[in-house]
Amino acid sequence: MCADLLPPATVRGMEQLDRDAFAKTVRVPHLIIPEATNLNSAARALKQYLLKMEHYKPIRSEERKITLHPIPVKQWEDLPVEPLKELGIEKDCLVWEEIKLSYENYKYDLILKAVLPENQEGLSAFSKIGHIIHLNLKNHLMPYRRLIGEVLMDKVADCRTVVNKSNSIQNTYRNFEMELICGVPEYEVSIKENGCTYKFNFSRVYWNPRLSTEHQKITDMLEEGDLLYDLYAGVGPFTVPAAKRGCTVIANDLNPDSYSALVINCGLNKVMRNVKCYNMDAVDFIKVELRNDLLAKLADDKFQGNIHITMNLPAMAVEHLVHFPGLFSGESIELRIKPLVHVYCFAQGADDKKPIAQQKVEQWLGVEVTDMLKEITFVRNVAPNKDMMRVRNPSALGMAKKANKLKDQPKQLAKKAKNVFAVSQTKKGNLKKTKEVAAKLKKINVQDKREKVDANFKTLHAQIVAKKTPKPAPRPLPAKNKTTPDTNKMETDLTKLEMK
């Protein structure tokens, strides 16, 4: 960008918007078009050389003058000379004249770049939801927030309200806490996304237009006749397009305002016949509605579609996976169709985020999922070294089997620990086996306290070894004289460890 065409340097640091301060005069090249020359033909020949700025007309028919950009045009030879000569335009038609620029001629990004601190990050992006612009300003920009809001209202079409996210999302209903920094406090919006219409109160629900592509990706995985359980449905960005595709959708959201908007949006898009809406806590929804409906679908041989479960609450969705194992306990049911779970989470760290996301899922499911995973996908970056990820797992609801495995883990642990301590009191030749068993114990995760339990095992093991009897004579003792380790005491010690 030519420095002469930028806002004046004197506006740097402005906190209260002064539109008059952006006025300036600059000299730029013009081409005077002779009366005998067709103005439109000349404009076509000069199309790539025109000076294009906000609210500035480079072609002035009444003056028969075309304003050119000063960067590509510094002299006559910079222009397409031969085509211009054919039109009767000669070198003496090129002149330099002054023009007046003002606040109206600058786009919002140029204005903010000129005003905000030069050596710090400026306004990188914002979201537009209907007539609302939603900002997430860094601390160093807070003194300029009123100015930023006014500039955006002036420059962004149809903007009537500008808000700034005031805190991280920590409330029960996961909606934004926001500050009105410019415009009117009107938060009812109507928007379109992926061919669907949504109405909601932006101040009372969660909506992120940056997830539009992700919503479409999930919809593209669905086919007519499929079944979708949408655990945190919000206002319906998964539910509505899935229902429009011919899927049956069981949708839930805890927020009463989201639930109301969900019902309205299903009606607006004429898909209510394919959707059941619930206003429940997600855990209760999993244990009751999802469980009962899924049992009925699995028992119905007529249902042959695929089953999907969307869990788009990245701050805590993985924690709710703990309720899936054992969900079908006490039921004689064949899992003839394995539900495909799409669970979202935040992964934070400087390295590859995929292993971090997988570890979170495994932590709450209680089993390794490496062999079950379909994919782990990057969704978007939410902060430095923090990404939103989607883990797609086709076997996360092998519920009965997973439940039995988890249920038996404490017994298996006790059995292995007993063997470790018994071997520790026998011959040195068996120490190798002891180490092998101890190594296996380290892989067992009991109540997500693996490291703590392992440390306690080692401490107890060391105490037992320290108290063992002196090494027996080389000649083996008769079987009747062999000492038997006090396994009852060891099992008692182990139980205490497990209860910690």
From Swiss-Prot:
Binding site for S-adenosyl-L-methionine: 215, 253-254, 281-282, 312
GO cellular component assignments: mitochondrial matrix; nucleus
Example GO molecular function: tRNA (guanine(37)-N1)-methyltransferase activity
Listed InterPro entries: MeTrfase_TRM5/TYW2 (IPR030382), SAM-dependent_MTases_sf (IPR029063), TRM5-TYW2-like_MTfase (IPR056743), TRM5/TYW2-like_N (IPR056744), tRNA_Gua_MeTrfase_euk (IPR025792)
Compartments (UniProt record): Mitochondrion matrix; Nucleus; Cytoplasm
Bias kind Basic and acidic residues: ranges: 488-500
Main location: mitochondrion
Pfam families xref list: TRM5-TYW2_MTfase (PF02475), TYW2_N_2 (PF25133)
Region listing for Disordered, in residue ranges: 463-500
Entry-linked SUPFAM superfamilies: S-adenosyl-L-methionine-dependent methyltransferases (SSF53335)
Gene Ontology biological process terms from the UniProt entry: mitochondrial tRNA methylation; tRNA N1-guanine methylation
Similarity comment: Belongs to the class I-like SAM-binding methyltransferase superfamily. TRM5/TYW2 family.
Job of this protein: Specifically methylates the N1 position of guanosine-37 in various cytoplasmic and mitochondrial tRNAs. Methylation is not dependent on the nature of the nucleoside 5' of the target nucleoside. This is the first step in the biosynthesis of wybutosine (yW), a modified base adjacent to the anticodon of tRNAs and required for accurate decoding.
Subunit record text: Monomer.
Name of this protein: tRNA (guanine(37)-N(1))-methyltransferase
Originating organism: Anopheles darlingi
